[in-house]
From Swiss-Prot:
Gene3D superfamilies: membrane protein fhac (3.10.20.310). It comes from Streptomyces bingchenggensis (strain BCW-1). Residues 62-131 form the POTRA domain. This is Cell division protein FtsQ. The gene is ftsQ. Residues 59-265 are extracellular.
Amino acid sequence: MAGATTAKGGARRTPPPGPPPPALKARRRLRLPRRRTLLVTGVATALLGSGVTWLLYGSSWLRVEQVAVSGTAALTPGEVREAAAIPLNEPLAAVDTDSVERRLRARLSRIADVDVSRSWPDTIAVRVTERRPEAIVEKAGKFLEVDEEGVLFATVPQAPKGVPLLQVEADRSPSSRHFGATRLRREAVAVIAQLPEKVRADTLSVRVRSYDSIALGLTRGRTVVWGSSERGAAKAKTLTALMKAVPDAERYDVSAPTAPAVTHS
C-alpha cells in the first residue's frame, strides 16, 4: 500500500513544507545578537588593554618620583640611591627591579640582602640588609670587616667597638692549603658565635693557627684554647663551668671538652 514513509520502516521522515518551526526561528534570531556581543566585548577588551598600557607607560602619572630606602646602618640612603641608579620620572612599571637588586649587590659589598619593589603610585622601595662584622682583620693600619661566612666585605679606618681582632697565622699550615683563608676565617667566626655571651663580650682576639687550632684572647690577659669549631655547644658549657670553678685561671683549654684543663698564672 502506497503512502508516507514511517519511522517504523527505517527511513528518515521528510519535514513537511511550510514555515520553519518557532524554535528554529528563535535560534536564528539569537545568532546575530550573540555575534554583536562578541564583537563589542572584543573591541572593549582591546580598548581597555590599550588604555592600561598608556596609563602605565605613556601617561605622566604612575612615574618614579622618589626612591625610598630603609634598613641602612653603616650605609646612608644616599649611597644606596646612587648605587641603585634609578632615574626619576621613569614609568614605574618600566623599572626592572631584579636588575636594580643585582646592581646594588655588585656595587655595595656591605649589602647582604636587598629587596626592590614598586610602591604605587610613584615610589620605588629599596629595603636593604647589611652585613654585620663578626671579626676584623688588621692590614696596613686599616681594618677589614669579616662577615659570618668569613668574607672580607669592607675596609674601615677604625676597629668597630666590641668586634674581636682575627689573626690567621696558618700560612705554613697544611690547613691553609687545604681549606683556604676564607674557610679558616669562617671557622673562626663560627667559634665566636658559639661562645657564651659573657665570654664573647670579653673576647679581644681570635688566633687561627690551623683548622683545629683556634684560641681566644680575653680581657685581663686570659686565654682560651678552643681547638676546632666542632662540638661548640659542649665546649661552651665546659668553659662556663671552668670559669665558675676557677675564676682566676690564666689559661682554659676546652679543645677536648670531656677532659678540660686550666693553667694558673
